[in-house]
Amino acid sequence: MSETVEVKTCDLEGAALDWAVAVIEGYDLMKHPFRRAFIPNFGYCDYSPSTNWTFGGPLIEKHRFEFEWIGSDWHGEPLRLFTACGCDMPADATSAGPTHLIAACRAIVRAKLGETINVPAELIK
């Protein structure tokens, strides 16, 4: 069995975030040697909803996400973050990220798997 690392959902990014969303959506990225998933209508492909609108866009529509731009903190420092909340998710599942896709993916993971999750160690940078 492969080793896992506990990661806060708000810190998930890259392959680890894509993997967590894939688990929720029912895709097993770890079975294929190149971490590719069989996606209906696409075949085997790199599933990357946190960076690819082809995969992340439908999730935003599915969960009816609303986004809010956080331009600066109370000191006026630029944050450039988006917060995302899915209309079909608990209110406390709101998450932030530097892009719409990352914020939405983190919110999905937080709503379905919680504040922290165990991720295969090989997916952590």
PLM regions: where:
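Glycine-rich anion-binding surface patch
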Residues: 1-125
